[in-house]
Amino acid sequence: MNRTYLINAIDSIATADGYSFYTDGEERMSEQIKSYPAAWLQPPKFQQMEGRKHGKVTYDVTLHVMEAEAKLSPAERQQTWSRLEDELIEIFSKLSDATLVIAVEDLKIRHTSSTLTTHGEVAATATAEVVTFF
């Protein structure tokens, strides 16, 4: 239940922020992404659980955000990475306010110098531990 809630919450936030949302393994990105900007959520990984009937479940979450146009100048690419970074911070900040989410911890954002798909895009990837309660 928490896993499904988490996926749906990220979907709602990313979609409201103007992203086309996708979720699956990374190997399927090129064939599934149809429009940009895109948000690609890898399936959340169950990390740990505390409690029996009530408690916490922690998931490792990886979210890629991508913008079309890999053929940007270096200055334009830097501006796009900066914007994507800000948008990832906003997505995870909003996620921390979701009903079943206790906290978003250890948020890390990295920029990729190569494309994640065969389409050609600028991408940034966020990883975080998301603590939910049940």
Q: What are these model-derived regions, one by one?
A:
Residues 34-45:
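A short, hydrophobic beta-strand-centered structural micro-motif
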